[in-house]
UniProtKB/Swiss-Prot annotation:
BP GO annotations: cellular response to oxidative stress; hydrogen peroxide catabolic process; response to reactive oxygen species
Cofactor field: heme b
Pfam families the UniProt entry points to: peroxidase
Cofactor binding note of this UniProt entry: Binds 1 heme b (iron(II)-protoporphyrin IX) group per subunit.
Start-end of Polar residues biased regions: 21-32
Organism: Debaryomyces hansenii (strain ATCC 36239 / CBS 767 / BCRC 21394 / JCM 1990 / NBRC 0083 / IGC 2968)
Keywords tagged on the record: Heme, Iron, Metal-binding, Oxidoreductase, Peroxidase
Protein name, UniProt field: Putative heme-binding peroxidase
Annotated region described as Disordered, given as residue ranges: 1-33
Amino acid sequence: MTAIQKPVVAKREAPKAEVNPTVSRSTQTETIKPTKERTVSVFSPPVFNFAANSFAQSVSNEYKHASPKRIKLDNSRVQVPSIVKPKQDKPRPPAIVTKPRVINIEFPNKQKSGFKLLIRPKHEPSIKKQKQGIEVLSTSNTKRITKSISVDDVEYVEKVKHAIKQVLPKPDYDDGSLGPVILRLAWHCCATYNKFTGNGGSNGSTMRFVPEITDDGNSGLDIARSALEPIKQKFPDITYSDLWTLAGKISIQEMGGPKIPWRCGRVDCIDDRYVPPNGRLPFAYKNANHIRETFGRMGFNDRETVSLLGAHGLGRCHKRFSGWEGKWTENPTSFSNDFYKVLLDEEWSLGTVPETGKEQYYNKDKSLIMLNTDIELIRDPHFLHFVKLYSQHQATFFQDFANAFGKLLELGIERDSNGNVLPKNEFY
Ligand code: HEM
């Protein structure tokens, strides 16, 4: 029996508080003045606060043995003609972009990390839409890929899959696996899709740029991106967008979930002008209307929505990222229908994460949690119907989840009859 002790009130909070001190919104508009080459400490950078900190955070995950010591800034500004083609229906003004500045990360042992950070300057007045972009790339792949491997290149994909499987186990992280956070990366890079405008979605891998990379909802996903970066270096022919979505599929399967349909061919857009605006990801403090509206915008019905939410049987909330804290189920690295069972069987009462003040639901012994949006699935009668169905029929859940997640990975992607992705001119 489900007993929710507090009456349900659709809680409206002020916009989400910034919980990650290293990612400050204000830095998005920070003007980066060109100066001579200089060295800046990663840990107290005066100007590149966001860039340096978030990058150092990413890199230090993979390179714990050798934390980055210094960042070298090459601040040369060179006027180069844009390689952006004008849109067919709306010709662009002749574009001049400023060459991005390059930051090389040096390690104590003097070896270069193999990464560099490109910081694109604030937009030129003539290009209204262009924002300052921050992109983390491997040095081996500064030429961004606007075409991924072909759907026929099965052998290459198999090698990438194998490499992804190798990075998933991580005994010193959370519950011993990067699977949940990598799955979340795949979901979030697709969840920006807007079926009404046709933009957003995984194609383009726009999460390499601000404002998407600094969207509050994406806090913590640098862990997943940096874990996959060495794979990108080793297999440069796969695009980030293909790699991140493939990694989501493999994570689900490796955690015991169903086989997710996936095809390659996504491209990486060459700059930040197609980054969707913040605010498209679902907000966990909101109600059923918001869930229906957000998933409806992506093209999902109630059944698909409830099946996708079953992924909350995996992983956990982190107060340092979202402000919420705790796991949904007892087995957070094992894909199952436990989320629905727990949601129905436990008694939930509203409480507060002491350190952040964020409200969430706790079960009786406070070992498990639910977010408001999770609880909304049993408050809303239409959602509740599917929660009950999936709690009783794991096979049905697996089938529905595989279909819905496969659909999620394809949002915004058009393919020809051979399965190859049709080019989106605006990306190049
Ligand atoms: C109403 C929709 C949703 C909301 C509001 C929501 C919100 C959240 C929040 C706040 C977290 C905690 C992040 C952190 O602190 O690290 C989280 C984690 C997670 N979410 Fe969702 N989510 C939603 C839907 C989904 C969907 C559809 C999927 C996948 C299909 C998903 C997969 C995950 C996973 C696997 C984690 C755990 C990540 C980890 O352990 O690092 N979520 N979600």
